């Protein structure tokens, strides 16, 4: 298939974003950010829906052979197992996903957990600013699936 044929099918030129994934990954992995102290973390809970939730699924697979218990929540509530040794990673590319916003509210009420949010903005960014929750604003590319490497490598960088 040549580019002309591809562009007739891929009218939004998603292939250009996918072609740039290695550069996007490198940019976010090498970005200077505040690191999280993991020495006392024995559980990580990822929360996100759709394409945002897939990032948590990937981390669950990556960490499956470690001693860290990993949960991926695609719903509204923080698991009761969360405690002071838990890192909660909330991911919403849009920043407006209802389930993830409610999960964030639930996690914020559980003050023992270490909490960090990754979003491109929206209501979630505003909530984090208002409640003084640590968050990283990540660029959104075209769609959640196109934004996958920017979110994945931003989280790997903490």
Ranges and model annotations:
Residues 24-40:
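A short, well-structured juxtamembrane/interface segment
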Residues 1-29:
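Cofactor-/ligand-binding subdomain signature composed of acidic, glycine-rich
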Residues 39-158:
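Glycine-rich phosphate-binding loops that contact phosphosugars or nucleotide phosphates
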């Amino acid at each position: 298939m040549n580019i002309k044929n591809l562009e007739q099918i891929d009218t939004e030129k998603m292939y250009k974003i996918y072609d740039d994934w290695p550069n996007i990954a490198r940019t976010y992995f090498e970005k200077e950010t505040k690191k999280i102290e993991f020495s006392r973390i024995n559980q990580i809970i990822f929360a996100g829906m759709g394409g945002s939730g897939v990032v948590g699924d990937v981390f669950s697979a990556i960490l499956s052979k470690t001693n860290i218990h990993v949960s991926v929540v695609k719903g509204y509530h923080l698991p009761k197992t969360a405690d002071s040794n838990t890192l909660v990673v909330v991911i919403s590319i849009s920043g407006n996903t209802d389930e993830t916003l409610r999960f964030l509210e639930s996690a914020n009420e559980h003050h023992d957990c270490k909490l960090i949010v990754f979003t491109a903005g929206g209501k979630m960014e505003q909530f984090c600013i208002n409640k003084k929750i640590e968050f990283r604003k990540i660029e959104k590319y075209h769609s959640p699936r196109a934004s996958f490497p920017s979110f994945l490598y931003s989280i790997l960088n903490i």
